[in-house]
Regions:
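Bacterial Sec-dependent N-terminal signal peptides
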Residues: 1-18, 182
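N-terminal amphipathic/basic helix or basic patch
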Residues: 14-16, 49, 53
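Short strand-turn segments of transmembrane beta-barrel domains in outer membranes
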Residues: 20-22
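Outer-membrane beta-barrel transmembrane domain signature
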Residues: 24-47, 51, 60-68, 77-182
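Short, intrinsically disordered low-complexity segments
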Residues: 55-57
Length: 182
């Protein structure tokens, strides 16, 4: 019984690739004390900041449509418009499926890195990122990085996909793009 449940059903893809575009981040407690360093903030306290970039992901379903392993690589211009990135791998599970609508939740180790903000005049270290003033990069490792992903099936092979990263209280991020079932 259990072995049969893990075999792919005809018509169900066991893998997909996604390309999503980032564009908006939200700081629930504001961007203070570094809001003034964020040139693309949409308000004086940097609650909302435009940070353009892309996320490329590969997902393999252990149990088709139910449980998967997903890897994500992203590059973007961070809140100060400097190069930053994210690398993550984790487990994901389907929360619900209703017709063409699906919602997934995922969690796993995540590495976040950015050009060092110490180079920016007026930067105040909030102790969130690791790195000294002489390092080229600042970094953060999270054992528990997570995401929620909503997908709407356009066809059996192609989905519109949106991602929400709930990094409360520091940062919440949004991305939208396409997911292609291989």
């Amino acid at each position: 019984g259990l072995i049969l449940c893990s075999l792919p059903l005809q018509g169900q893809s066991r893998q997909n690739i996604s390309l999503k575009f980032m564009g908006l981040s939200f700081h629930p407690l504001s961007g203070r004390p570094n809001a003034k360093l964020m040139p693309n903030r949409l308000d004086p306290e940097a609650y909302f900041v435009v940070d353009l970039g892309a996320l490329l992901s590969y997902e393999y379903f252990i149990i088709p449509e139910i449980l998967s392993v997903k890897g994500i690589q992203g590059l973007y211009a961070d809140c100060t418009a400097q190069l930053a990135g994210v690398t993550s791998i984790g487990l994901r599970a389907r929360i619900f499926r209703i017709g063409r609508h699906r919602l997934y939740g995922g969690i796993g180790p995540t590495w976040i890195y950015r050009r060092n903000w110490y180079r920016l005049p007026g930067y105040v270290d909030t102790k969130y990122f690791e790195g000294s003033p002489t390092d080229k990069w600042q970094r953060k490792f999270l054992w528990y990085g997570g995401e929620l992903e909503y997908k709407y099936a356009l066809s059996p092979k192609l989905d519109i996909a949106t991602t929400f990263v709930p990094g409360y209280p520091d940062l919440m991020a949004f991305a939208v793009g396409l997911s292609y079932n291989l």
